[in-house]
Amino acid sequence: NTVVNDYVVRAAEKLRSEKQKSSRISVFIRTSPFDDNESYRAIKSYSFIYPTDDSRDFLYAVRKILPKIYRPNYRYSKAGIMLSSFSDIGYVQNSLFNESHTYKMDSKLMQVIDELNLNQKQIYIASQNIGRFKPIQRNMISPRYTTRWSDLPTVK
């Protein structure tokens, strides 16, 4: 759950940096496709009434979705999220019942968090995987001959 929450927060940060909002989030989990004994995969989506870029909204949706697709006693090998139904931040249609003053405060809060986290993570949302997240290890990666000069082999 905490790894998925990290993905959600990172996706929301990217969404805000691109001045976009999303009105749909999908969460997926699966076991290894090579393990014949226990194969399981599931995906479920949550649609918002109004497009959002708020990390807390996406985390709320994940808390609703995960219990519906999670099955105990499986060894999951992959989990992830997908955002869809994008709209530009300036083209969001408001409703008569939409509380725009809270939207402005929420937007400002996310902006402040993004500014503080710009160079180094300083603020986390409580459900994130603080300090336990291991970045992808790149010690077994293949050389990038076509995109990096330093990876080209030299002939002597």
Predicted regions, residues:
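Basic, low-complexity intrinsically disordered segments
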Residues: 1-156
